[in-house]
């Protein structure tokens, strides 16, 4: 049974009873079922900086961080809470992430063009050959019953420029899964969080990496099999947020990995111990044997 408890707090404006209204639902293990923020009437008079923008005061932003962080870091499958946590802590890391994008020609072009990956994007990718980035992205989405627009929109970041930086990271996250053949399961989501922290220094990824494994049944096995690979790959590879993925849809995914200086996890016994990962790799091998994979020199 889930009990919804509305809690009203008035901070910094005692005349406004609606200043802050977080809606928190508790289950038996205190899992947040919904967490929404309604701005104070004073903030509603401000000009919205982009469609869907919800301006928050510092106090509201702090409460959003705490409320979403308590459960979000423990349950990385709660995309809504992870999204809220990442936005409420954006001031810590987004400027640095934006600077990383500005350091490469490809990253600067992304910020100039501001491309977005939508459901319409993937329709034309279905015709590409197996083994291309675009087609494997479509196959990965289909295998998990996901779609590009299932990601939460950016709402709480004031700067339109930084809001797009966050949107870009959010929309390309599933491409990282595709690049490394990682299925959308908790152990592999956590592995990717470790990699993202190593690659982009994301605080949310760090928190998820530290607390998320508490929910794993095979913590020690996961730590041994995935953490060293994720840390090394993230550290040694190119910053993934600077990749203009849309210009690489037709590129062989193995060729792309070599260009970015990254590799999949080929440590001894990893495939045998992780069935979801093994299944993706086996499908690729079978397509290669049939000659239905793009011709590229890569160990498989």
Curated annotation (Swiss-Prot):
Disulfide bond positions: none
Cofactor(s) recorded in Swiss-Prot or TrEMBL: Zn(2+)
Domain of life according to the entry: Eukaryota
Main location, first listed in the record: mitochondrion
Catalytic activity: a 4-hydroxy-3-methoxy-5-(all-trans-polyprenyl)benzoate + H(+) = a 2-methoxy-6-(all-trans-polyprenyl)phenol + CO2
UniProt pathway: Cofactor biosynthesis; ubiquinone biosynthesis
Localization of this protein: Mitochondrion inner membrane
InterPro entries in alphabetical order: Coq4 (IPR007715), Coq4_euk (IPR027540)
Protein keywords: Lyase, Membrane, Metal-binding, Mitochondrion, Mitochondrion inner membrane, Ubiquinone biosynthesis, Zinc
HAMAP family noted in UniProt: Coq4 (MF_03111)
Note: This protein may be expected to contain an N-terminal transit peptide but none has been predicted.
Assembly and oligomerization: Component of a multi-subunit COQ enzyme complex, composed of at least COQ3, COQ4, COQ5, COQ6, COQ7 and COQ9.
Name of protein: Ubiquinone biosynthesis protein COQ4, mitochondrial
Organism encoding this protein: Cryptococcus neoformans var. neoformans serotype D (strain B-3501A)
């Amino acid at each position: 049974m889930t009990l919804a408890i509305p809690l009203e707090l008035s901070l910094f404006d005692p005349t406004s009873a609606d200043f802050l209204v977080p809606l928190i639902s508790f289950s038996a293990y205190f899992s947040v079922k919904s967490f929404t923020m309604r701005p104070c009437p004073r903030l509603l008079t401000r000009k919205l900086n982009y469609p869907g923008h919800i301006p928050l005061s510092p106090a509201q932003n702090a409460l959003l961080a705490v409320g979403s962080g308590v459960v979000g870091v423990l349950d990385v499958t709660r995309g809504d809470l992870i999204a809220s946590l990442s936005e409420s802590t954006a001031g810590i890391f987004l400027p640095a992430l934006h600077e990383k994008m500005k350091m490469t020609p490809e990253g600067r072009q992304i910020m100039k063009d501001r491309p977005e990956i939508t459901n319409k994007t993937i329709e034309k990718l279905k015709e590409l050959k197996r083994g291309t980035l675009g087609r494997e992205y479509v196959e990965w989405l289909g295998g998990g019953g996901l779609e590009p627009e299932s990601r939460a929109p950016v709402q709480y970041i004031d700067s339109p420029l930084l809001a797009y930086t966050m949107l870009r990271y959010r929309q390309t996250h599933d491409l990282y899964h595709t690049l490394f053949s990682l299925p959308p399961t908790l152990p592999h989501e956590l592995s990717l969080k470790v990699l993202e922290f190593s690659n982009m220094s994301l605080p949310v990824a760090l928190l998820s990496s530290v607390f998320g494994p508490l929910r794993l049944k095979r913590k020690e096995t996961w730590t041994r099999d995935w953490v060293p690979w994720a840390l090394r790959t993230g550290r040694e590879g190119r910053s993934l947020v600077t990749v203009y993925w849309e210009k690489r849809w037709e590129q062989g995914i193995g060729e792309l990995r070599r260009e970015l200086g990254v590799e999949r996890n080929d440590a001894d016994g990893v495939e045998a111990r992780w069935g979801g990962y093994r299944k993706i790799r086996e499908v690729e091998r079978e397509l290669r044997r049939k000659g239905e994979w793009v011709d590229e020199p890569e160990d498989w």
